A protein has these predicted regions:
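NAD(P)H-binding glycine-rich loop region in Rossmannoid oxidoreductase-like domains
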Residues: 1-12
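Conserved active-site helix of classical SDR/Rossmann-fold NAD(P)-dependent CH-OH oxidoreductases
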Residues: 15-16, 63-67, 120
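Conserved Rossmann-fold NAD(P)-dependent oxidoreductase catalytic core, especially the SDR/UDP-sugar
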Residues: 16-53
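Structural signature of the Rossmann-like NAD(P)-dependent dehydrogenase/reductase core
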Residues: 30-33, 73-74, 111, 135
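Mid/C-terminal beta-alpha module of Rossmann-like enzyme folds, strongest
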Residues: 121-173, 202-215
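Short acidic donor-binding/metal-coordinating loop in glycosyltransferase active sites
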Residues: 4, 34, 77, 138
Length: 215
């Protein structure tokens, strides 16, 4: 949102350029989009055909960049997971870098998946004839307070999470196509398996070791 011109180029123009290159190579493009294409004002979870009513430059540019046709695939979701860069900025990295206590918003609703699950879905999509638009979710939702509590539980991080009832946009979404041949697990299972994966690959995620009680 700080650089709308750059956002339009990267989020809106570039995916379509990639699509053209994929067409030339007779290949399928798998593009990742976001729940931020929605404003969060709908009273029920968003489905694939809902109007993309996000208002800011990021939302509009991501919406324009979605590739929805019979040859390519857009996976619309939201993700949480560890980052390779030390100055990460997403929720998991932010939480793991905090000390003392943090706020957890009980009315900030989330329907996404871990980066580990998204990788599994992408791997599956490469091998299967699935195209168009697909919502990657377990068709449930969780509030950000409960999500942080799960991360605390499985990392054994010494931190207090204060529940805060602050009204937030509800961008929850569901998958109405149901074409995956495996079940996306519960949030507790997703977080547990993600932390297990990190412990099995400590050399990659060593930046998080000092912020976790699990070694």
């Amino acid at each position: 949102n700080l650089d709308p011109e750059n956002a339009i180029f990267i989020n809106a123009y570039f995916p379509h350029r990639l699509m053209s290159l994929a067409d030339e190579l007779n290949s399928k493009l798998i593009h990742i989009s976001t729940d931020c294409v929605f404003s969060g004002t709908k009273e029920m979870p968003y489905i694939e055909k809902d109007f993309k009513d996000g208002k800011d430059a990021y939302a509009k540019s991501k919406g324009l960049g979605e590739i929805i046709n019979k040859n390519h695939l857009t996976l619309r979701t939201s993700v949480i997971g560890p980052e390779l860069k030390r100055d990460g900025e997403e929720l998991f990295h932010w939480f793991m870098s905090q000390t003392g206590q943090v706020n957890g918003f009980t009315q900030a609703i989330w329907s996404g998946v871990t980066t580990l699950i998204l990788a599994k879905v992408v791997d599956w999509a490469i091998e299967h004839e699935i195209t168009g638009l697909y919502h990657v979710t377990n068709n449930n939702s969780i509030d950000k307070y409960s999500l942080l509590c799960l991360i605390k539980k499985y990392t054994k991080k010494n931190i207090s999470i204060i529940p805060v009832e602050d009204k937030k946009p509800n961008k929850s979404f569901i998958d109405t196509r149901n074409e995956l041949d495996f079940i996306i697990p519960s949030y507790e299972v997703m977080i547990r398996k993600m932390i297990d994966m990190m412990l099995q690959n400590k050399e990659i995620y060593e930046q998080y070791e000092s912020n976790s009680a699990r070694k």
